[in-house]
Swiss-Prot record:
Chief localisation class: cytoplasm
Domain KH stretches: 17-67, 101-154, 241-293
Keyword Zinc-finger in annotation: no
Organism placement in taxonomy: Eukaryota, Metazoa, Chordata, Craniata, Vertebrata
One Pfam family named in its UniProt record: KH_1
Family matches, as InterPro entries: KH_dom (IPR004087), KH_dom_type_1 (IPR004088), KH_dom_type_1_sf (IPR036612)
Protein name per UniProt: Poly(rC)-binding protein 4
Function, as annotated: Single-stranded nucleic acid binding protein that binds preferentially to oligo dC.
């Protein structure tokens, strides 16, 4: 048995279908594809995994591996040893300098990274110690997505064991809410998913055909009406502004702001919404957060903020998914909406995973159906109050840093 197969015999086999996405540089992609595609063809045949590589001329590409757990791990093993072979063949500068370790960058939804890190970093520390590989979870989201890069470095055998343990963790902790996947060749705009409505994706895309819309309906399991491009008939979506206001505990506001304001700037850029965090009032345990912009921008900004809070709660000792009853979930109804909010967008929302949309042809603005003349019955604006993760108030703000 070769060393590339040694790590595949450990642990019980899981009878499920696994999908693993990796971010690779152009040189790495070229090595995996090989001359006339011979290398990737051999990996597909020997591992029985389905391997796709995203198109595009950008420096980075997404490699997606799908199949049974045995097939996926076998493919990862072959990729790791191929990259190690390339590093051995590369001429060393100076002769005495040791070659760099093999590095794989996994792409994982941010809502699952909290479980991967564990309480106070205990889980990721355990993975490092038991596998011998170096693992680091990026502190920032990948551009225009709700995913993070998880970097795994070391010798091929250590990487294989590490990927096994990472996959075991993410399989036990499914992603929460909608996932906006990272794709280097796409410039995703804002996304809104709402009950009795389709989804809206704005960006630089080509034409969409009714056949493609039907395919999206089948993939998502929900109807996607092919309607007018206007959110509210006769009005430009970019001009329909409204505001939402909610409270965030002082001990969690740091994860929303980020180091030197990096996180809040990222959320503003991704959502296109204006986000204002109020000053801390004397004796108050919460901070006011006001989001202003189009309904689409507000929905995405609210989701991104909630994802930050969920990650911070998981790393601070809270149980993932055990949010207080008054914690707003992704794409929840408007919290404190101004009268200018379009009534048709105040429906009860739900989240659809966008992961299935990767690999489809470029999609333009898929319009929402015309808004109803009045708000849905029984819906009233409210202000949700978020409790601290441990139910107490802390004097100092909790800071979130990458592990």
């Amino acid at each position: 048995m070769s060393s590339s197969d040694a790590g595949l015999e450990e642990g019980p086999e899981l009878s499920i279908t696994l999908t693993l996405r990796m971010l690779m540089h152009g040189k790495e992609v070229g090595s995996i594809i090989g001359k006339k595609g011979e290398t990737v063809k051999r990996i597909r045949e020997q591992s029985s995994a389905r391997i796709t590589i995203s198109e595009g001329s950008c420096p980075e590409r997404i490699t997606t591996i799908t199949g049974s757990t045995a097939a996926v791990f076998h493919a990862v093993s072959m990729i790791a040893f191929k990259l190690d072979e390339d590093l051995c063949a590369a001429p060393a500068n100076g002769g005495s300098v040791s070659r760099p370790p093999v590095t794989l960058r996994l792409v994982i939804p941010a809502s699952q990274c909290g479980s991967l890190i564990g309480k106070a970093g205990t889980k990721i520390k355990e993975i490092r110690e038991t596998t011998g590989a170096q693992v680091q979870v990026a502190g920032d989201l990948l551009p225009n997505s709700t995913e993070r890069a998880v970097t795994v470095s070391g010798v091929p055998d250590a990487i294989i064991l590490c990927v096994r343990q990472i996959c075991a963790v993410i399989l036990e902790s499914p992603p929460k809410g909608a996932t906006i996947p990272y794709h280097p060749s796409l410039s995703l705009g804002t996304v809104l998913l709402s009950a009795n409505q389709g989804f809206s994706v704005q960006g630089q895309y080509g034409a969409v055909t009714p056949a493609e819309v039907t395919k999206l309906q089948q993939l998502s399991g929900h109807a996607v009406p092919f309607a007018s491009p206007s959110v509210v008939p006769g009005m430009d979506p970019s001009t329909q502004t409204s505001s939402q206001e909610f409270l965030v505990p002082n001990d969690l506001i740091g994860c929303v702001i980020g180091r030197q304001g990096s996180k809040i700037s990222e959320i503003r850029q991704m959502s296109g919404a204006h986000i204002k965090i109020g000053n801390q009032a004397e004796g108050a345990g919460e901070r006011h957060v006001t989001i202003t912009g189009s309904p689409v921008s507000i929905a995405l900004a609210q989701y991104l903020i909630t994802a930050c809070l969920e990650t911070a709660k998981s790393t601070s000792g809270g149980t993932p998914g055990s949010a207080p009853a008054d914690l707003p979930t992704p794409f929840s109804p408007p919290l404190t909406a101004l009268p200018t909010a379009p009534p048709g967008l105040l429906g009860t929302p739900y989240a659809i995973s966008l992961s299935n949309f990767i690999g489809l042809k470029p999609v333009p603005f898929l319009a929402l159906p015309p808004a109803s003349p009045g708000p849905p019955p029984g819906l009233a604006a409210y202000t949700a109050k978020m409790a601290a993760a441990n139910g107490s108030k802390k004097a100092e703000r909790q800071k979130f840093s990458p592990y």
